[in-house]
UniProtKB/Swiss-Prot annotation:
Annotated signal sequence range: none
BP terms from Gene Ontology: G protein-coupled receptor signaling pathway; negative regulation of signal transduction; regulation of postsynaptic membrane potential
Motif Nuclear localization signal mapped to chain: 242-247
Protein name: Regulator of G-protein signaling 7-binding protein
Species this protein is from: Bos taurus (Bovine)
Protein's gene: RGS7BP
Membrane topology: Lipid-anchor
């Protein structure tokens, strides 16, 4: 390094000083970028699948609540029976489809049966199980109520029919036409056939949901299978172990106005 005219050494320029202390980082290899990108993309897909499953279970929960409200309305004189049964059929069909989709999505994101389980997945399993149990219970209630209404409509005589057809015709002849509001025998027979069809369809859907509930219990991860009913509410971080009990706020079947 040359000396300055006054005897002092020249200081290195600013660019030279910065280059001296510059730390060079080795560039990432192509494989590192791919691994980092694939890991982030996989985590994003998993979270998106979890969110979709959570939304689907919540929608099924709401559908079960709506069906329950319809079941409670069976026998209400202010509700038209044909329109009520049609609405129940639509709601029940939509709920069964949601239940099947929720089970498929939940089974896809749960991972290995003996592996660690995320608390949110555990919660979704419990919510779906509770909703299915309530759903089948409400279907059984609707079958009992529809059958009871059908029985009372036919009459309470031991023979199953209230009055003979001749008696009905005589009563209709004695009553003025403008005041005759009683249904005809043909209407009664058609109504009875429709109610019987609704009962059969409800029984079919109830059996399907019971089978789905059995599949759900079979495909549950081992940490959930090994827990009893009281400890299922202790959704602790994975791996799932028994800790002190805490309250479970995942309520089922609430309809917000």
């Amino acid at each position: 390094m040359s000396s300055a005219p006054n005897g002092r050494k020249k200081r290195p320029s600013r660019s030279t000083r910065s280059s001296i202390f510059q730390i060079s980082k080795p560039p990432l290899q192509t494989g590192d970028w791919e691994r980092r990108g694939s890991g982030s993309e996989s985590a994003h897909k998993s979270q998106r699948a979890l969110d979709d499953c959570k939304m689907l279970v919540q929608e099924f929960n709401t559908q079960v609540a709506l069906y329950r409200e319809l079941v409670i309305s069976i026998g209400d004189v202010s509700v038209s029976c044909p329109s009520l049964r049609e609405e129940m059929h639509k709601t029940r069909t939509k709920g069964c489809e949601m239940a099947r989709q929720a089970h498929q999505k939940l089974a896809a994101i749960s991972g290995p049966e003996d592996g660690e389980i995320h608390p949110e997945i555990c919660r979704l399993y419990i919510q779906l199980q509770c909703c299915l149990e309530m759903y089948t219970t409400e279907m059984l209630k609707s079958i009992c109520l529809l059958g009871s209404l059908q029985f009372h409509r036919k009459g309470k005589e031991p023979g199953g029919g209230s009055k003979s057809l001749d008696c009905k015709i005589e009563e209709c002849a004695e009553t003025p036409a403008l005041e005759d509001s009683s249904p005809s025998p043909v209407d009664i027979q058609q109504h009875s056939w429709q109610v019987s069809t609704d009962i059969e369809n409800t029984e079919r859907d109830m059996r399907e949901m019971k089978n789905l509930l059995s599949k759900l219990r079979e495909t549950m991860p081992l940490p959930l299978k090994n827990q009893d009913d009281s400890s299922l509410l202790n959704l602790t971080p994975y791996p799932l172990v028994r800790r002190r009990k805490r309250r479970f706020f995942g309520l089922c079947c609430l309809v917000s106005s």
